[in-house]
Structures are given as C-alpha cells and as structure tokens.
Amino acid sequence: DGRIKTINFQIESGILFDRKNKFHLEQAEELGVPQIDIVICNLYPFWEKPDVSTIDVGGPTMIRAAAKNYQNCVVAVDPKDYGLVEKALDDEFKRKQFAAKAFYHLSFYDSQIGSFFSEEKFPEEITLPLRKNQELRYGENPHQSGALYILPKTNSPLGKLKKLWGRDLSGTNVGDIYAGLETVRQFSESTAAVIKHLSPCGIATGKDAEEALDRAIKADPVSAFGGVIVTNKPMDIETAKIVALFKQESEGNI
C-alpha cells in the first residue's frame, strides 16, 4: 500500500553520496544511483490528525539525509522557502540554513508524536514543540532580542495577543501579561491587576471593571508606574478613560 515508496536504496543513496568524492561517484555510476540535488518534502499533518496512520517515516528519512548532506543537496520543508531553492544550489551558507531548519522541523514533528504516545508525567527526556508567534521589541532587557513561542493547539491567551495601538511587546511585557492573567482568572467578580516585573503592585475587585481598575491603580500608584494593566471583564468607555489617564502618567502597556 505504498509504505516503502521513498525508503529506497536508489533515492537515499542519490541524496547522500558525496559529489566531491571520486569513490562515491564511481559507485553511484556503477549502481545506477541518480544524483538528487533537491529534496522538497511536506510531512504527513500529524498535528491535524494525531494518529499512528499519520506518522510519516519516509519523509523524515529523506529530509534527514538531505540535511546531513547539505554541502551537496538542498532541502526545503517550508513552502515559504521554495522560491529560494534555486539560489541555494550555489550558496552553501543558504543550504546550511535550510538544513538547520529541516532538523528543527523534524524535532518539532517528532516531539508531538512523542507526546501522543507518552503516558509518563515526567519522562526522562522531553522536547517541547514550540512555534514562533511573534517577534518581540526586546527580551527581558532592552539589549536582548526576543520572540514569543507558543505550544500549538493550546488555548493560551498569549497566542491571541493583538496590539491595538502603541509599541510592540517586549519579553517583560509578555511575562507581566501572563502573570496578570493568572492573577485575575482566580476571581469570578470584576477584578483588575497592575503588574510590574511579574509581581502585582495592585489588585482589586469592584462592581465592574471601572471600579476594580481604579482601586487597583490607587492601591500603589507609585509602583504602578510603567506597569501592565489586566482585567477579567470587558472594558467600557469609562474604564478606557481610566486607562488613558494611567497611560498619560506612566509608560505602561494597555
């Protein structure tokens, strides 16, 4: 039923042999092995339908072989890179970049399969399949670069962040937002928190978001300077006015 179509001596040898090795060239010619210079492969979508039937075997084999032999072969696993394949044929640095991306892609793929099979709470080894969600303004400190990575198919609100206005988020902002969400979600009544460096400097409840936020800011207005505001209820125009005033007086994020 086609299970071993690509696990084939001719294919794998054609990908792996060294074009600069005279002995390899002679053997390839003797055995009728074709020279395969480009491998473009999309894996079975295991993340869409986690099942034994969607575990790819032949695809990863070809990808791994091509990535290992990046000096002689171009491997592409992302459709966004297809337009760069021809250029990579004459650019070893680009081929190496593609190889690194291929190995990361395989690791991402296999980690999901491992999670599917595992019944251990704390396995001896673990790899998290993280996918980049967005570039950040900086990491924990302004001199550091950073990006936000999210576990796929999770309902994390961090993966749904949408900037409506202002500067891009920093790593510190993301941490503060997470800390704020984990704080206010503990309450059923209207609750607001002002978070700074992962710690709340003001938490309050009220009859609505407006009252809760006003109380949270007034709990420690000095420490609230530059903080992140989080509420567990929708904001109305009156709440937005408090946010606007807070923004005028500090460099906090909304």
Question: For each of these PLM feature ranges, what is it?
Answer:
Residues 33-154, 161-164, 248-253:
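Internal alpha/beta core interface subdomains
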Residues 23, 46-47, 201, 237:
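Glycine-rich nucleotide phosphate-binding loop and flanking beta-alpha elements
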Residues 19, 56-60, 174, 213:
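Catalytic, metal-anchored helix/loop core of enzyme active sites in primary metabolism
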Residues 1-7, 26, 38-41, 100, ...:
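Non-catalytic interface/targeting segments
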